[in-house]
Amino acid sequence: MTAATRLSNVEILISASEIARRVTALAETIVTKLPPDLMIVSLLRGSFVFTADLIRALHLAGAKNGIRPQIDFMTLASYGAQATSSGSVQIVRDLTQSVEGRHVLIVDDILESGRTLTFARDLIKQRGAASIKIAVLLEKPGKRKMPIDADFVGFTIPDKFAVGYGLDYGNYYRELPFIGVVEVS
Ligand code: IMP
Ligand code: MG
């Protein structure tokens, strides 16, 4: 199977170079707004590619404010293998470090209903974080079921199912260097 046939049902929405430019711009904004001793909480699995690029962009952008983030991961599940939200969020794997008294930046792939990020934010708040901000690569407007917004947004996208750059459909397509859309049933 060639790469072209493997991806015949994926339409490119945002190219790799557009993503790179936007991640750099986001990092430049983030370093002016947040303290250098950040705790980054990356929500797995969808945000691992975005987080990996964002922390390096933060390093490059943060020469002046001396940013030195710590990174931790939490696996939350709300979708399972389907493309429709099950409505409840569960911790599949928890953080390894305490967030008490820390300035936390939660990083996620996409803000849709807002259930995942509401759950993560409330949990981290309950655990005594000093401050909490949210950065998402993508957001879909008009889909929110919870009153939550991200402080830093990469791209606002139409109401289609996005894959690539860490985002999946049935745990496939995460490796794509661009963001594409697929038809889901
Ligand atoms: P929310 O809880 O509905 O805001 O959805 C957040 C989670 O659902 C994200 O972290 C993704 O894992 C998943 N999700 C929502 N929309 C998409 C999409 O278009 N493509 C891939 N995953 C998505
Ligand atoms: Mg996710």
Region locations from a protein language model:
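PRPP-associated nucleotide enzymes
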Residues: M1-S185
